[in-house]
C-alpha cells in the first residue's frame, strides 16, 4: 500500500500508506537502569512560567501579530476555503507527475535507485494535505472551511485508493527488490522501507488476477460501508425501560434519586429511563432493589436482529477478504506487521494475562459477594450478577497518588515542559501566532525547543469545547518529519500548462523545511494539534481547574506529541506515531505513569516551595482487577470474531460471546443480551483490541525497571529517547523494548516473548493496590 495519513492516533485513517525506515547508528553507552533518585530539579524558566499565563489568562495572550499575516499553519496561500481546494488540485497534479516518474523508473538504473525515496515523497505530498484537511474537517468553526476540507480530503483519498492497487507501482518496486545490485546499494533504512511497501501492496491484493482483484475491491468497499453502519448502530441509544417508583425505594442518592421518586409519585406513572443516561447510571450505583438494575442492564445490552446482522456480515466479509489473499483469517492478515505477528501469539499473551489476573479478580468478586451477602442478610455467598457491579463497587473518580493543590491547564503545561527538559533537554515555549495562522481564537501555539538544536517542531493546542468541534481528546499529526534536501524535485517533470499549480504545491511544501544545527541535511519539522474539551477559563471565575482524569488525558496526549517531535526520521512514513498499532500507545501510557511520582508532581510548583511525598493516597479497589479481567475478555472476543470460525454456517456472534463468558468469564452471561453490537472497537481495532492491554504491560515494565526510582534522571530520559522515541516506527519494536529493558531474549518477538509481556502486567499493576 502507498500511505496512511497520520491524523488522529489510531483513528480516522484511510487504509493507505507508504512507510519508511530510519537506521541511524545508536550511540553506545553504559546501561543505566533506575537507581536511587539523586538528581536535583532544574529550576523553572521564564518560558515555563509564561505557559501558565498563556493558558490560564488567555485574554492576555490572544493578541495576534497584525504586522505579519499569513494563512493556516503559516502557509501564506491558505487564507480562504477556496485556497484549500486549489491546493488539493495542485497537489494532485504533482502527485500524478511523481507517480509517472516512478512508473518510468524501470528505464533507468539511476531512477530505480530513487524509487523508495520517491514513494515516500509521494506519500508525504498527499498526506501533507490530507492530514491538514482532516484537522480542518474536525476543528474549524467555519462551515465553508469544513466543506473545503471535506473536498480536499475526499479528492486526494480517492487518488490514494487508485494508487493502493496500482500494479505498475508494485511492479517497479519488485524490480528494485529483485535486483541484487540495487538491493545492496540500499542502506538498511531504505531496504526495510521497501519491504514494508511491498508487504502493504500485497495486503491490498495487488498480485491477484484481475477478476479476483475486482472482488477484493468490492469486498473492501462493502467492509467500509458495513463498518460505518456498525458504528452508527453501536452509538444508537437503546430503548428506555420502565421503572416503578416502588423499585426505587431506599435509593442511596439523595439528589437525583429523590427527584426521580418525586416525579414518579407526582405523575403516578412508571419512569421511562434510558440506558446510559445520568438517571440510569445513578440507579445502577444507588438502587438497593435488584430489579431496576437488572432491567436497565438488559435494556443497555439489547440489540435488534438488524444490528446483529450488520456486525456478523462485517465479520464474514473481513474473513472472505483475508482468504482471498491467501490468509487463514482477518486476524492473520492484520497481525502480520504488528508486534504480535500472528493470532497464536496474541492468544499466548491473553492466556498469560488471564492466568495471572484471574486469582486477583476472583478475590475481588468474593469481596463483592460478601457485600451482597451482608446487604441481603443471606446465609451463603450469593452469585454476583452483571448488574451488581456498580452497586457493590461504585466507581470512584481517578485521584492523584498524593494530595495536590488545584491544577490549572497552565500549571500542567508548565510541569510538562519542566519534565521534558529534565528527560530530553526539550521544553515548550509560548509562540505568538500570526493573524490567520490559527482557525479559532482559543488556539494557542507552542514551540518545542531543543537545548542544542533550537525549535524542532510545533504544537497547536485547541483545548476548549465549542459547537462543531470533534468531541473527546485527540492528537493530530498535521505534518510529519522527513529529510527533504535529497528530494531531486527537478526531475519530477511537468505537464504542459501546469506550471502555476506545481509552483503552488512546491511553495506549500517549502514552508515546512528547516536546517537544524548539528544535523546533516534539511528537514521537514513535525507539527501536531492537540484537541481537548477542558473547561474554559473566564474573567469572573479565573483559571479552570482540571479534574485528575483530565490531567492524565493531557499527559497521555502529550506523550503522543513528544513521540512526533522526537521521532524525526528521514522517511515520513515511519516518523513519530507512524508505527505498529500494538506499539503506538507505549509513549503515551508511559507518560501517565510519571504522574505517580511525587518528584514529577512537584514540577507543578514553579518555585519549588511545596514539599511532596508519598503518603498513601491510593486505596484498595476490588473492582480494578474485575475491570482488567473484563478488558481481557473483550480482547479474546475480538480474536474469536476475527478467526476462521466466522465463515462457519453455524457462526452466531451472540452464542460465541455467551459461551466465552460462561467458560472463561467471572460473572455469568445474561441471556437475551448482545453487547457485541456496541463494541465499536471491533471496527477500528479489528483483531488488535489487545493492543492497549499490551502497551500498558510494556509501559508498566518500562516505568518499573527504568524510571520509577529516578524519574527526572536525564541519562534515563536520553536512553529512552535514543532507544525508542527517536526511531518512530523505523525500527523493530521488539528490538527497541529488549534493548531498553536489557532483555535480549525479547528481541525475537515470538510466542514466549508475548507470554512474558503477559506476565509483566500482573507484576506491575494487578499485583499492586490500584485506583479505579
From Swiss-Prot:
UniProt keyword list: Hydrolase, Metal-binding, Metalloprotease, Mitochondrion, Protease, Transit peptide, Zinc
Disulfide pairings: none
Co-factor remark: Binds 1 zinc ion.
Sample GO molecular function, one term: metal ion binding
Catalysed reactions, semicolon-separated: Release of an N-terminal octapeptide as second stage of processing of some proteins imported into the mitochondrion
Superkingdom assignment: Eukaryota
Major enzyme class: hydrolase
Transit peptide: 1-33
Location within or outside the cell: Mitochondrion matrix
Pfam families: Peptidase_M3
PROSITE patterns in the record: ZINC_PROTEASE
Active-site residues per Swiss-Prot or TrEMBL entry: 557
Essential cofactor(s): Zn(2+)
E.C. code: 3.4.24.59
Binding site for Zn(2+): 556, 560, 563
Family membership: Belongs to the peptidase M3 family.
Descriptive protein name: Mitochondrial intermediate peptidase
Organism, scientific name: Coprinopsis scobicola
Amino acid at each position: 500500500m502507498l500511505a496512511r495519513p497520520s491524523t488522529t492516533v489510531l483513528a480516522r485513517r484511510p487504509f493507505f500508506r507508504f512507510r519508511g525506515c530510519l537506521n541511524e547508528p545508536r550511540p553506545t553507552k553504559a546501561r543505566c537502569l533506575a537507581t536511587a533518585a539523586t538528581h536535583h530539579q532544574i529550576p523553572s524558566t521564564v518560558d515555563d512560567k509564561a505557559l501558565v499565563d498563556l493558558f490560564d489568562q488567555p485574554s492576555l495572550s490572544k493578541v495576534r501579530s497584525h504586522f505579519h499575516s499569513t494563512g493556516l499553519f503559516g502557509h501564506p496561500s491558505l487564507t480562504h476555503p477556496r485556497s484549500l481546494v486549489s491546493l488539493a488540485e495542485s497537489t494532485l497534479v504533482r502527485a500524478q507527475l511523481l507517480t509517472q516518474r516512478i512508473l518510468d523508473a524501470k528505464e533507468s538504473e539511476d531512477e530505480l535507485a530513487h524509487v523508495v525515496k520517491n514513494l515516500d515523497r509521494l506519500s508525504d505530498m498527499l498526506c501533507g494535505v490530507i492530514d491538514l484537511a482532516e484537522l480542518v474537517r474536525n476543528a474549524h468553526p467555519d462551515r465553508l472551511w469544513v466543506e473545503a476540507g471535506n473536498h480536499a480530503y475526499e479528492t486526494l483519498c480517492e487518488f490514494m485508493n487508485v494508487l493502493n492497487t496500482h500494479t505498475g507501482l508494485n511492479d517497479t518496486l519488485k524490480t528494485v527488490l529483485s535486483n541484487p545490485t540495487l538491493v545492496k546499494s540500499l542502506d538498511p533504512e531504505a531496504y526495510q522501507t521497501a519491504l514494508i511497501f511491498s508487504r502493504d501492496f500485497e495486503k491490498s491484493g495487488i498480485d491477484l488476477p484481475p477478476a479476483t482483484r475486482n472482488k477484493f475491491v468490492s469486498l473492501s468497499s462493502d467492509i467500509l460501508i458495513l463498518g460505518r453502519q456498525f458504528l452508527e448502530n453501536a452509538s444508537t441509544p437503546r430503548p428506555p425501560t420502565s421503572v416503578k417508583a416502588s423499585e426505587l425505594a431506599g435509593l442511596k442518592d439523595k439528589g437525583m434519586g429523590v427527584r426521580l421518586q418525586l416525579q414518579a409519585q407526582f405523575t403516578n406513572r412508571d419512569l421511562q429511563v434510558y440506558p446510559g443516561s445520568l438517571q440510569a447510571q445513578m440507579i445502577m450505583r444507588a438502587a438497593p432493589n435488584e430489579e431496576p438494575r437488572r432491567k436497565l442492564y438488559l435494556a443497555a445490552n439489547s440489540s435488534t436482529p438488524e444490528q446483529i446482522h450488520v456486525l456478523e456480515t462485517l465479520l464474514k466479509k473481513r474473513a472472505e477478504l483475508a482468504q482471498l489473499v491467501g490468509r487463514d483469517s482477518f486476524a492473520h492478515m492484520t497481525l502480520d506487521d504488528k508486534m504480535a505477528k500472528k493470532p497464536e501469539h496474541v492468544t499466548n499473551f491473553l492466556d498469560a494475562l488471564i492466568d495471572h489476573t484471574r486469582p486477583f479478580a476472583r478475590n475481588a468478586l468474593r469481596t463483592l459477594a460478601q457485600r451482597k451477602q451482608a446487604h441481603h442478610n443471606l446465609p451463603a455467598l450469593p452469585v454476583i450478577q452483571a448488574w451488581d457491579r456498580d452497586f457493590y463497587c461504585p466507581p470512584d473518580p481517578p485521584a492523584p497518588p498524593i494530595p495536590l493543590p488545584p491544577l490549572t491547564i497552565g500549571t500542567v503545561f508548565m510541569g510538562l515542559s519542566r519534565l521534558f527538559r529534565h528527560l530530553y533537554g526539550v521544553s515548550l515555549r509560548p509562540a505568538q501566532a500570526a493573524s490567520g495562522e490559527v482557525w479559532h481564537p482559543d488556539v494557542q501555539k507552542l514551540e518545542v525547543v531543543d537545548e542544542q538544536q533550537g525549535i524542532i517542531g510545533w504544537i497547536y493546542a485547541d483545548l476548549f469545547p465549542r459547537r462543531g468541534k470533534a468531541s473527546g481528546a485527540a492528537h493530530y499529526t498535521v505534518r510529519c518529519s522527513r529529510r527533504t534536501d535529497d528530494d531531486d524535485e527537478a526531475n519530477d517533470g511537468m505537464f504542459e500548462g501546469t506550471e502555476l499549480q506545481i509552483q503552488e504545491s512546491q511553495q506549500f511544501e517549502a514552508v515546512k523545511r528547516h536546517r537544524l544545527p548539528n544535523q546533516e541535511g534539511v528537514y521537514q519539522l513535525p507539527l501536531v494539534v492537540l484537541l481537548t474539551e477542558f473547561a474554559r477559563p473566564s474573567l469572573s471565575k479565573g483559571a479552570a481547574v482540571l479534574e485528575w482524569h483530565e490531567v492524565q488525558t493531557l499527559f497521555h496526549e502529550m506523550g503522543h506529541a513528544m513521540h512526533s517531535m522526537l521521532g524525526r526520521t528521514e522517511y515520513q512514513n515511519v516518523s513519530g506515531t507512524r508505527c505498529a498499532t500494538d506499539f503506538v500507545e507505549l509513549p503515551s501510557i508511559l507518560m501517565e505513569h510519571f504522574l505517580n511520582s511525587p518528584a514529577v508532581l512537584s514540577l507543578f510548583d514553579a518555585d519549588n516551595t511545596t514539599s511532596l511525598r508519598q503518603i498513601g493516597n491510593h486505596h484498595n479497589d476490588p473492582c480494578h482487577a474485575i475491570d482488567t479481567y473484563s478488558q481481557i475478555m473483550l480482547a479474546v472476543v475480538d480474536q474469536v470474531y476475527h478467526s476462521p470460525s466466522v465463515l462457519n454456517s453455524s457462526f452466531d456472534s451472540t452464542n460465541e460471546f455467551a459461551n466465552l463468558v460462561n467458560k472463561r468469564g467471572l460473572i455469568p452471561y445474561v441471556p437475551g443480551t448482545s453487547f457485541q453490537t456496541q463494541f465499536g472497537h471491533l471496527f477500528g481495532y479489528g483483531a488488535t483490541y489487545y493492543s492497549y492491554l499490551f502497551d500498558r504491560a510494556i509501559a508498566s515494565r518500562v516505568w518499573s525497571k527504568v524510571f520509577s526510582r529516578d524519574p527526572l534522571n536525564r541519562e534515563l530520559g536520553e536512553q529512552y529517547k535514543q532507544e525508542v522515541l527517536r526511531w518512530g516506527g523505523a525500527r523493530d519494536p521488539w528490538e527497541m523494548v529488549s534493548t531498553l529493558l536489557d532483555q535480549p531474549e525479547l528481541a525475537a518477538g515470538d510466542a514466549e516473548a508475548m507470554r512474558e509481556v503477559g506476565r509483566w502486567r500482573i507484576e506491575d499493576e494487578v499485583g499492586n493496590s490500584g485506583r479505579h
